Every structure is written in C-alpha cells, then in structure tokens.
C-alpha cells in the first residue's frame, strides 16, 4: 500500500512538472507586462486618418465597402524589424473607369496606423528577403510628426495586391514613451478610384442621378464622351444634367424620371476596407526568465525519472528478498 501511494505521488509530480510550464507559456505569450495597458489625398485634408469613431477617412471618398486583411507577428522584441503584410484582394480581371472615361487596370493604396514608437524600418535594417517582398514600393509618413502612420500608393493592383511594410519596433529602454504592452494596429486599403473628390464633387466613377422630376426629352452623346440629358420638369422648367465620360445611361428619351432617380449605371468596381489587429511588444527579460524556468523544469523531470527508477530498483530488491 505504501509503495502504491509513493508511486501515485511521483506520477502527480511528473504531471505537474509538465502542465505548469505549459500554463506559464500561455500566460507569458498572451499577456504583456501590464494589463494597463488615403492615403496620399487624405493627407491634404485630414490631420489624422482615423476619426474618433474609429472610421478611417478614406471611406469618405471610396464609398463601396470591400475587405482588407493584415498579418503581423503575435509578439515582437524591442528594436527589431518585422513585416506587416496588408492584403487587398479583388478580381484581377476587372477594369475600372479612368478619369478620361476609358477602361484600365485598378490601382491599390493603403494606410497603416501603428502604435506610437513603431515606425518604418531604415533601409540598412531591412533584410534582403523583406526587400524582395517590398519591390519598388515607396512608403512615407502621414506627416512629419506622425512617423507611426504610413501611407503607400496608388500603385498597380496586379503587382501589389499584397503590400509588405517593413516595421521597426521601439525600445522602451530608449524611448520612454513606450512600454512592454499589447498594442492595436489599424489598416485601411482601397482598390480602384474614389467616387467623391476632396471638394465634395463627384468623380466619373459613380452613379449620376436626375436633379429634377420630369420627362427626358432629349439625350445627346457628346463628341469627347459623356452625355447631356435634357429634362422638362413638372413645373415647366427646362434643365440639363451633364454626365461625364465613363458611366453609361440607363434612361431613354420620353421616359419620366423622379428626383434622385439614377440616370446611369454604377461604373465603380473597387472599394475601401479597414481592419485591425494586435501586437505585443515583448520584454526580452521575460523570455530569458522563461528559458531558465524551462531548464529548471527539465532538470526537475530528469531527477524525478531517476528517483522513480531508483525507487523501482529498491522495490524489486525488497520483493526478491
């Protein structure tokens, strides 16, 4: 009976020696030290690309909603270079309406909002592997005093539907404004041209609607593209709606239209999306402590196994005796 109890006690020790480090690993990698814890055009009109509501301002001009994804490491050490990969997916076969009304390939652009202290990695710190992924992309800060906000584009979408940002993490021992914490990262990405200009006027990449209720009496296709639609309103006025090159009309002469009724199709095939993720700025001292802890656990397990074998030998000797 005593031998059985001793064996049970040894088995429990071995179980604890395995389960404790696993729990400790989850705790260290999940939580930081403390629980406290568009692009180019947007620069001209907005001090910050992210509104208080969390909405990224690029959505003010790019009205259609699309998806965007971001991939970053779960945790990084201070003063290290890592990749932030922004994915802007779309159908590569699509063609968009260009400013002259003709069809062309889509461009993409992105804005990456990093935590304070994180910034674009200097060229001499970027590895050849990351440089190859970057290609000929040129990144810039949103403003001279906002180095943690990076913008890129517009660039050809067929080549850069995945954009790799080389990021340098801060060192809290040097930058006292940063801490070993879990931080949020925000990203916005668009494909294709916008529907609204900064001054509020429409581009030719959107729907054009009737400005009055009445009858379409005449439609003229202009020599350089676009249309003039003449409408006799119900109150006797005569108005002309101008359609720029690009959208195609969906009304015909003699048709009655209401106010804000679409006169054209929607030529837009692009759109804007935003996403967010988190990253932990990990304290290297914690990692060193974790390694030492694992070494001590492994040694403890070895000693437990040796002790168990020694006990079994004694038990066999007693049985033979």
Curated annotation (Swiss-Prot):
Cofactor remark from the record: Binds 1 heme group covalently.
Cofactor: heme
Lineage: Eukaryota, Viridiplantae, Streptophyta, Charophyceae, Charales
UniProt topology in membrane: Single-pass membrane protein
Family: Belongs to the cytochrome f family.
PANTHER family: CYTOCHROME F, PTHR33288
Subunit structure: The 4 large subunits of the cytochrome b6-f complex are cytochrome b6, subunit IV (17 kDa polypeptide, petD), cytochrome f and the Rieske protein, while the 4 small subunits are PetG, PetL, PetM and PetN. The complex functions as a dimer.
Domain of life according to the entry: Eukaryota
Protein name: Cytochrome f
Record keywords, A-Z: Chloroplast, Electron transport, Heme, Iron, Membrane, Metal-binding, Photosynthesis, Plastid, Signal, Thylakoid, Transmembrane, Transmembrane helix, Transport
Signal peptide stretch: 1-35
């Amino acid at each position: 009976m005593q031998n059985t109890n001793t064996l049970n006690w040894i088995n429990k020790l071995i179980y604890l020696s395995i389960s404790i480090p696993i729990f400790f690993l989850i705790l260290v990698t999940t939580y930081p030290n403390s629980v406290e814890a568009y692009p180019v055009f947007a620069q001209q009109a907005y001090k910050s690309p992210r509104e208080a509501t969390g909405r990224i301002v690029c959505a003010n001009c790019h009205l259609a909603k699309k998806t965007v994804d971001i991939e970053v490491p779960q945790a990084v050490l201070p003063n290290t270079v890592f990749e932030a990969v922004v994915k802007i997916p779309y159908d590569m076969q699509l063609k968009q309406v260009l400013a002259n009304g003709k069809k062309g390939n889509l461009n993409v652009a992105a804005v990456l909002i990093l935590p304070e202290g994180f910034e674009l990695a200097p060229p001499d710190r970027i590895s050849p592997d990351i440089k190859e992924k970057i290609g000929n992309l040129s990144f810039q800060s949103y403003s001279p005093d906002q180095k943690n906000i990076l913008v890129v584009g517009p660039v050809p979408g067929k080549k850069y539907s995945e954009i790799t940002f080389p990021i340098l993490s801060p060192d809290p021992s040097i930058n006292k404004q940063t801490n070993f914490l879990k931080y949020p990262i925000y990203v916005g990405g668009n494909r294709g041209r916008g529907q609204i200009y900064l001054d509020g006027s429409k581009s030719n990449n959107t729907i054009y609607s009737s400005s009055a209720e009445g009858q379409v009496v005449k439609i003229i296709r202009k020599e350089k593209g676009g249309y003039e639609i003449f409408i006799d309103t119900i109150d006797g006025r005569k108005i002309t709606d101008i359609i720029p090159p690009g959208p195609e009309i969906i009304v015909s002469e003699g048709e009655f239209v209401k106010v804000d009724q679409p006169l054209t199709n929607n030529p837009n095939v692009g759109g804007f999306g935003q996403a967010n993720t988190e990253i932990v700025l990990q304290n290297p001292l914690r990692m060193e402590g974790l390694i030492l802890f694992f070494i001590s656990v492994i040694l403890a397990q070895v000693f437990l196994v040796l002790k168990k074998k020694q006990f079994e030998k004694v038990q066999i000797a007693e049985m033979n005796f």
